[in-house]
Each structure stands twice: as C-alpha cells, then as structure tokens.
C-alpha cells in the first residue's frame, strides 16, 4: 500500500497514523510538508515550499484563497515529481483548508483522496459573531464566505472526509455532511494520566511550586479572545484577592493564534496586565512547553480553566480531562459536547469572570467532592477518546 500524507505542519494530526502505517514493511508511506524539523521511523518526509505568499495588492477577501492556491501549486509540483519517480499513491490523506490537497485529483486521478476537515467558516452562529462587543459587519460576512473557497473545492473533490467532533461537522454545509465521518484523532491515555499528589517543578524555566497547595492552570497556543484570555486575566484578578495562597500557571505563547491581532503590535497579554494589576509573584507565564513539562503542569493542577468561543475544540482540553484535571470550562457548544456540568467538569458563562472565579473557588473549597468529577473526567476520555481504540478504527476507515 502506498500512502501520501499532506499537511503544512509535521506530524500534526497524522502523527500516529503515519507512524503505525510506517511500521508495516508492506507499506510505503510518504509525508509531504513544509516543516523541516522532525522525523518518523518508516515514513519518508518530502518537503515543498510555496513560491511566494499572497500579494499585498490582492483583494483582502481573496488573500487566503491565493495562499491556498500557492500551497496547492507547490504540492502539485511535489506530487508530479513523486509521480515521475513512480510513486503513485493508493491513498492521499491531507488537511483541508491550507490548500495542499487542492490539485491532487489532477495529478493522481485514480488515487483515493481523503481530507481532514477541521472547520468551515460561518459568519453567524459560531465563532465570528459570538462576542457582542465585537460585532461583524458586511465586509466580515463577505470575507468569511470567500474563506471557505478552498475547503469547498476539497469537499467536492475528496472521496471521503473526516471531522473530529460532532460540533465541527455541523459547521459544514448540509449537502456535504454525508461525505463526512465524525472521528477524533484520539488521546494517549497511557501518557496523559493522573499522578496523585503531583508537585510542579520545572528546573528548565526555574519554576518550583512544590510547596504550593493551590495551582490554577490554563493552556492555549496563544493569548487571545478566541480562547478567553481577557476573561482569564480578569478572573485571576478576582481570585488573587480571594485566594492569597493560589498560584496561576499560564502555558502559551504571547501571540494571537486565532482571530484578530491588536493594532500597533500590542498584545492581549500586555493590554490585560495593564488593565488588571496582578501580583506577578503568583502568576507564571511559561511560554509553550515540551510535552513532558506540559504534562507535569496538568498533573499538578488543582483547577484547570478552559475557555473557548464556539470554535475548534482544543486537544489540550481532552488531554486535561485524561489527566484527571478538574476543568472549569466555558458553556459553549464544543465544550458541552464533552463536558456535562457537575458530572465530569464545571461549566461557566464565557463572558462572566466573577462566575468563573466563583466556580474555581467552589472547586478549591471542595476537593473531596471534586474527586468524583475528576475520575469521571478521565473516564470520559478512556471511554470515548482513547487513542488505542480510535486509531484502529481510523485505519479501517482509511482502508475502506
């Protein structure tokens, strides 16, 4: 079997699939990407690079499409070189949206094309118009509509597609949903597991909270409104007054991963820390962490805050549940698909820092009561998101 994976990042969502398929000597697994770092045993990584990025003078609605076409064009050239070297994949599996899969049916018309569909953009009813303080206008509506162009081309071209959650599948046009299967990538429950009385000591960044009894954690790729960062900082300002022994660990980069950036190179971290003066001795910004350090943060967490607009569900929330974290999460659709209030976590209004703080205090004040919720949190992942159960099913789906 010859399999071609396509994703601008490496190994991304295809890490376990590529590794498992690469272990079989009967398979030839090739991974097309533009990320140079990293390797997987049994997988041949081949690189592509866009000739340029979208030009500034391109209409701003069309820039994402132009970038996707340029990505697809680079992958087309890569695919043609693979074809010239007699590599004709039986299966192509790529991530839709960036553009790598756009022209695969032109190079390999007989190959099965599978696409990983993470998100379909809608101006109303999900992330874009969620915040009443940041309303969208006609320009936004038009821009968002055009942003789906490369995804729509993939929906048309692919043989089948996969979406990781029910909520994410529901964002796609109804007429294409029969093509999509809901199947999560899976969480490694043998890696993400609780450790009783875990202490947080990270020598690499000189962080030692081994003597701290209350640690509230937060994890995100960036620090932005999409993942509730402004609400988090306001919540911390309330909690610092009410819990003088509590420390806060924020894992993430000082950037915007999703949504709009602020003008004049400002960051949401800088703006929020000016707005809410905090005791910086009790708040620890770690930047992004290697997996083993990130795991230690989750294992030592007293309460883990997860906030998101109605958008793509973060792997980190599921990893936190698997680790037995007590999650205080936003009562938004992607979270409610997994967490039931008072059963395997505590839900709060995304926009109400006082309520978020109150539920964090509720969790800190009732550790015995929360043990059952923590146990149920892990049970949720073991039963429904266990990588070792889902990976064989994912492989079966690919081979259909």
Where are the regions a protein language model picked out?
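Conserved acidic donor-binding segment of nucleotide-sugar-dependent glycosyltransferases
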Residues: 341-342, 346-353, 362-367
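Acceptor-binding helix/loop patch of EC 2.4 sugar-transfer enzymes
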Residues: 52-62, 111-149, 190-199, 254-263
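Nucleotide-activated donor-binding/catalytic signature segment of Leloir-type glycosyltransferases, i.e.
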Residues: 255-256, 261-288, 292
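Acidic donor-binding loop of glycosyltransferase active sites
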Residues: 159, 296-312, 325
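Donor nucleotide-sugar binding/catalytic pocket of nucleotide-sugar-dependent glycosyltransferases
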Residues: 122, 140-213
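N-terminal subdomain of nucleotide-sugar transferases
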Residues: 1-44, 388
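A short, well-ordered alpha-helix in the C-terminal region of glycosyltransferases
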Residues: 355, 362, 369-384, 390-396
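Conserved donor-binding/catalytic core segment of Leloir-type glycosyltransferases
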Residues: 203-227, 233-238, 248-249
